[in-house]
């Protein structure tokens, strides 16, 4: 949200929530609390409480029991809209045809439901940008990233929808992290910056214990990069598909990273048609850009 706030050419039109790091109720409450903290008035609607098939994840504590542990947030000063997130997505896309970028930083269930509810949505959207997947090591499993793994059917539907799509996975976002020293520097700011520091400290501690990492990965802000400053991440137009059936690989994102020539051998499977712009390399400017956006939002929220 800080990056959106700092980008003068973008306008936050709506916020939707989905199950994931915690229950839908907790995630929605967190969104409303953060809106109050940052003085954001965008409408908020709760969405899916579980994936398209089966039940949602249980006992997800990487962000604590509330889904956003580590800081004391203000009590929400409003309730979510009395409509489902899918309806808010459709209303917003219908009102801003050809302009709306749908940024998905959690499970893709709401997006898949919206696309299946209104087939015209794919033509109304300017783009979809996703934080999810990995071309290497996963986090939920050895090869699957959490946001895709919790609802691979939804992810598969979204990637096949034909909407211009940008994807940034763990192999990139894990290289976009803040150190303990950078987190400490945020404490020199106001309430919002100090709250972000508290949240990042908690997350860094969790990542150290669970994954042995020494930086707090800034996963979600990376999804917004192509529409804020395309030079902050290098992308490749290629194919990404979701594994739905593998016993060990369900939820894995399979990306075409080969450089096949014009000569094909019978034992080599040809490339699928490109369907996404896949993040490959973050710029050294990205972390300073995100920290500067947090500081700017902190000043405006004071």
Language model regions located:
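Short glycine-rich anion-binding loops that position phosphate/pyrophosphate groups of nucleotides
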Residues: 49-50, 107-108, 230
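Metal-dependent C-N hydrolase catalytic cores
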Residues: 28-95, 272-285, 291, 295, ...
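Conformational coupling and interaction surfaces
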Residues: 3-5, 11, 149-151, 168-302
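A residue-level signal for conserved active-site and pocket-lining positions in enzyme catalytic cores
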Residues: 44, 158, 224
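Short, mixed-charge aromatic SLiMs
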Residues: 22-26, 30, 53, 135-137, ...
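Short, surface-exposed amphipathic charged segments that create phosphate/polyanion-binding patches used
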Residues: 57-64, 142-145, 183, 257
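Active-site histidine-anchored catalytic micro-motif
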Residues: 1-33, 66, 72-175, 180
């Amino acid at each position: 949200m800080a990056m959106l706030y700092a980008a003068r050419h973008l306008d936050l039109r709506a916020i939707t929530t989905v199950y994931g790091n915690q229950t839908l109720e907790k995630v929605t409450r967190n969104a409303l609390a953060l809106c109050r903290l940052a003085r954001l008035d965008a409408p908020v609607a709760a969405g899916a409480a579980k994936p398209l098939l089966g039940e949602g994840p249980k006992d997800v504590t990487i962000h604590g029991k509330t889904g956003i542990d580590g800081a004391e947030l203000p009590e929400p000063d409003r309730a979510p809209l009395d409509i489902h997130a899918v309806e808010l997505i459709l209303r917003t896309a219908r009102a801003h045809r050809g302009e709306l970028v749908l940024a998905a930083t959690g499970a893709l269930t709401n997006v898949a439901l919206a696309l299946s509810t209104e087939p015209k949505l794919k033509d109304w959207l300017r783009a979809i940008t996703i934080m999810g997947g990995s071309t290497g090591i996963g986090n939920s499993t050895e090869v699957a990233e959490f946001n895709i793994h919790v609802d691979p059917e939804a992810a598969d539907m979204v990637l096949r929808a034909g909407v211009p799509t940008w994807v940034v996975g763990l192999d990139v976002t894990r290289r976009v992290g803040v150190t303990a020293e950078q987190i400490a520097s945020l404490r020199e700011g106001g309430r919002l910056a100090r709250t972000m520091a508290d949240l990042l400290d908690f997350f860094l501690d969790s990542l150290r214990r669970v994954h042995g990492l020494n930086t707090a990965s800034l996963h979600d802000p990376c999804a917004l990069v192509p529409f804020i400053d395309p030079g902050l991440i290098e992308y490749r137009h290629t194919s990404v598909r979701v594994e739905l059936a593998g016993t060990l690989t369900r939820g894995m994102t399979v990306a075409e990273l080969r450089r096949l020539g014009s000569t094909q051998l019978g034992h080599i499977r040809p490339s699928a048609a490109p369907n996404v712009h896949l993040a490959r390399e973050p710029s050294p400017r990205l972390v300073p850009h995100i920290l500067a956006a947090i500081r700017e939002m902190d000043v405006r929220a004071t």
